[in-house]
Amino acid sequence: VKLGNMQARRDWGFAGDYVRAMHAMLQQEKPVDYVIATGTSHSVYEFVVEVLRSLNLIPAGADVAQVVNEYVEVDPKLFRTGEIHDLRGDAAQARSALNWKPEVDFSGLVRMMVESDAGIAANQSAKPQFAGKA
């Protein structure tokens, strides 16, 4: 897989958690702008490591960086100009006013994404393949 800046850090969150926050916002008497975020950031590199762990591709005792290098090629052409290195939101106001907090952590989110993609891939490979036009 070709990726750009593996050190870029993002506030990765689960859409279902954000939908719960949006619903809570809509229940307020007066509209208020809230930051909805996990409050923690993880690098693209950490994301890749979690994906590889979820797929059991990092053997016990293995050099993690070496395993990552087997699967990922960093392509400088994919780096964003003017990229903000660390994007992390502060959802303190939403946590307080809406009594909201994210339920799915980073590892859980990655695991859900991997399992979802594995299910999609399994469904696609189970479909009959036709030669020619359908």
Give names to the regions the model predicted.
Residues 1-134:
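C-terminal substrate-binding subdomain of Rossmann-fold SDR/epimerase-dehydratase oxidoreductases
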